[in-house]
Amino acid sequence: MKKITMKDVRKQDYYYAEAIKTLQTNVNFAGKDVKAILITSCYPNEGKSDIAFSLAREIASSGKRVLLLDADLRKSSYVGRYQVQAKVSGLSQFLSGQIGVGDLMYATNFENLDMIFAGPSVPNPTALLGEGLFGTLLKKLREYYDYIFIDTPPVGSLIDAAIVAQKCDGAIFVVESEAVSYKVAKKAVDQIEKSGCRILGGVLNKVDMKKDKYYSHYKDRYHTYYEKIENRQEDRE
């Protein structure tokens, strides 16, 4: 496996670091059958890719074998965001038959963390992700990795995330504080649920910690909704 260097130049405060650790704990308690986890949002720029990278890196640092898979075949940002200097191949090239699996995966400079990049943007990402080759790839990856985090395009305007969700064990929603209405978030969650994917929870991102009253109200409302989700899942069992 080829090795690449990813530079994390983001500034993270104490609250962010602690939130990622809490998210890691919640993922660990999701169950041993939860390996492939989709991470998405309602709209672009809510911070889902930052959360995906931070969570993958945190869990990898605990000794777990982790793969971060960028399935945003429309507008990927990982190569530029993390200053990857090497020329890399990606998922779009693999799914279109241009490269084999041996040229798809990269070991990063972060211990236990491997990466699959999205590759060049393509005109038919929905069709590529919906084909059997993607499911076959995930099946093989499950045999080696403890966790596979799959970063997809936002749910709000594209169907890609729902297609990928069909092949995942769980999903995490990233919601930007004060940017997404409860109605929009609920509609996005429902769309993923219809694919048969279990909702593991949500992340309220970009919170202004000085606005305690707003944060508490917003958090409580989303917490109530996810409690309903958990209760529905328990009823099914």
Give the residues covered by each predicted segment.
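Conserved catalytic-core segment of NTP-binding enzymes
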Residues: 118, 126-224
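Alpha-helix N-cap/loop-to-helix initiation residues
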Residues: 16, 45-48, 157, 181-182
